[in-house]
Amino acid sequence: MNIADGRQAFPAPAKLNLDLRITGRREDGYHNIESIFCLIDLQDTVYLKPRDDGKIILHNPVGGIPQEADLSYRAASLLQKYARNPAGVEIWLDKKIPTGAGLGGGSSDAATVLLVLNRWWQCSRTTQQLIDLGATLGADVPFFIFGKNAFASGIGEKLIGMDIPKQWYVIVKPPVHVSTAKIFTHEGLTRNSASSIMPTFQNLQPFRNDMQAVVFKEYPEVWKAYSELSRYGFALMTGSGACVFTACQDRDSAYNIYRQVSGLYEAYLAEGLSKHPLLSV
């Protein structure tokens, strides 16, 4: 994990929403959801180097945005007030998870920063306290802090561990960026799905994504990618898109599909994880 210049490398895995239902709109403008979150081994690497001068420096903000707007920088800044000593950090992001894809890359990076700096800075935040902090950064951050496959409700911050069968996933990213805000404010979005009484992996099947129909209508490229992937099995969109995926029981089956679609689209072959890699560190 250690590399020559004093930085340390930490994993930030992606996620898939194997099922996503919108159960209502909240008074604060957010939506209540119910979703199955699954970790996969497609991951970014977050490099961190401690500082003792209290400065937080993000060396390569994603997409050219100001560092103060980046989720990883904001995560460190949010946690800093709990540090026992004047603590700082330098951050580098090695991005492998595509952005704007529904895979949670930015949220996962932020969660990794919170998890590591909570130890480094001796902040003594519990997992639940970190989840509460993460929820102020984004709806997906709590799941990555929770660190296990889960059934999520609320805006995504209420999490219950869920056993998910070992699966391989073929993920296709169409050449388009989906605006999450546009989808959540769309008049055609389903917002009244019934809440689950017994939320288990088996009981929630057949899986669906309540955002999918609206995204297909507004972004034909996502529909095209979904249609192509559906030739090989049951396909579904993750999050608010743009990625679509299909699940396989073994790597060989997944690889055969990956070979077919990777010539047409940016595609990924990923294995499902049972827990966040940082839980093993």
Swiss-Prot record:
Enzyme class: transferase
Gene Ontology biological process terms in this record: isopentenyl diphosphate biosynthetic process, methylerythritol 4-phosphate pathway; terpenoid biosynthetic process
Catalyzed reactions: 4-CDP-2-C-methyl-D-erythritol + ATP = 4-CDP-2-C-methyl-D-erythritol 2-phosphate + ADP + H(+)
Ligand binding (ATP): 98-108
UniProt-listed PANTHER family: 4-DIPHOSPHOCYTIDYL-2-C-METHYL-D-ERYTHRITOL KINASE, CHLOROPLASTIC
Pathway listed: Isoprenoid biosynthesis; isopentenyl diphosphate biosynthesis via DXP pathway; isopentenyl diphosphate from 1-deoxy-D-xylulose 5-phosphate: step 3/6
Keyword list, A-Z: ATP-binding, Isoprene biosynthesis, Kinase, Nucleotide-binding, Transferase
Organism: Neisseria meningitidis serogroup C (strain 053442)
Molecular function GO terms recorded: 4-(cytidine 5'-diphospho)-2-C-methyl-D-erythritol kinase activity; ATP binding
Sequence similarity: Belongs to the GHMP kinase family. IspE subfamily.
Enzyme Commission designation: 2.7.1.148
UniProt xrefs under InterPro entries: GHMP_kinase_C_dom, GHMP_kinase_C_sf, GHMP_kinase_N_dom, IspE, Ribosomal_Su5_D2-typ_SF, Ribsml_uS5_D2-typ_fold_subgr
Top-level taxon of the source organism: Bacteria
Residue spans crossing the bilayer: none
Name of the protein: 4-diphosphocytidyl-2-C-methyl-D-erythritol kinase
Catalytic center residues: 15, 140
Record function comment: Catalyzes the phosphorylation of the position 2 hydroxy group of 4-diphosphocytidyl-2C-methyl-D-erythritol.
Pfam families per UniProt: GHMP_kinases_C (PF08544), GHMP_kinases_N (PF00288)
